[in-house]
Design a protein with these regions (language model features):
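Solvent-exposed alpha-helices and their adjacent loops that cap or buttress functional pockets
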Residues: 7-11, 28-32, 43-47, 138-139, ...
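PLP-dependent enzyme catalytic core of the Aspartate aminotransferase-like
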Residues: 165, 174-208
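Active-site C-terminal subdomain of aminotransferase-like
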Residues: 41-122, 137, 206-208
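A short linear hydrophobic-aromatic micro-motif
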Residues: 131-135, 168-173
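Active-site phosphate-binding strand-loop segment of PLP-dependent enzymes
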Residues: 1-24
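Conserved PLP-binding catalytic core of the aspartate aminotransferase-like
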Residues: 131-162
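Conserved active-site segment immediately N-terminal to the catalytic lysine
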Residues: 17, 31-42
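Short beta-strand-to-loop capping motifs
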Residues: 55, 148-152, 184-186
Length: 208
């Protein structure tokens, strides 16, 4: 986690397929450059249970093999996403979320908002070294998910107690990687990021 392509790779005639679950609707995307874009709604759009697919039928029709009808995107496109019973609740809440986004200024406004949050947190991670250390190369950092570790893992219990006391939830990183992961999806206000930064600054001052 914590890695994001800051550019769209040039794949020539080969259709580009992208899982945009984490940053779908977080910034403008030139969809014409992709053969397939897909993403789970549960990051920036709404609750779990819905998946978004954008695809070019001309570039995805020749699979070279037999597919289950449910896995053939052309069937869903031909039936206007009603090939089977849709997850009504997830779709409805996603609609409400997108109405909120529109009132906030749309995807361009989300990009500005998200960049400010990421700059705030990554700035703290870099400034508070060597107590904290980012796990991703600067040029590959994800705007949506910032990952970092403590240089001294023996201090993790003390840091965990501090951020939990501040009302922060789910900061622990993936169990296979360890460390910490701060998710900053569209709905998260910058004030919440500031709470984490304040906790980190307090901890670094005490343990640096």
């Amino acid at each position: 986690g914590g890695v994001e392509y800051p550019f769209t790779p040039d794949t020539g005639a080969v259709p580009l397929v992208a899982d945009m679950s984490s940053h779908l609707l977080s910034r403008p995307v030139d969809v014409a450059r992709y053969g397939v874009i897909y993403g789970g709604a549960q990051k920036n759009m709404g609750p779990a249970g819905a998946t978004v697919y954008l695809f070019d039928p001309e570039r995805t029709g020749n699979t070279g093999r037999t597919l289950s009808p449910m896995l053939d995107l052309r069937n869903h496109g031909a039936k206007e996403s009603m090939y089977n019973t849709p997850p009504v609740y997830a779709v409805y809440v996603s609609m409400l979320t997108m109405e909120w986004m529109k009132k906030m200024g749309g995807v361009a406004a989300m990009e500005k908002r998200n960049t400010a949050k990421a700059d705030l947190l990554y700035g703290a991670i870099d400034r508070l070294a060597p107590v904290f250390k980012g796990t991703t190369a600067v040029e590959d950092r994800s705007v949506m998910n910032a990952t970092f570790v403590l240089a001294d893992t023996a201090l993790e219990p003390a840091f965990d107690a501090l951020w939990k006391e501040a009302g922060i939830n789910g900061l622990r990183g993936h169990r296979s990687v360890g460390g910490y992961r701060a998710s900053m999806y569209n709905a998260l206000p910058i004030e919440s990021v500031q709470v984490l930064v304040d906790v980190m600054e307090h901890f670094a001052k005490k343990n640096g």
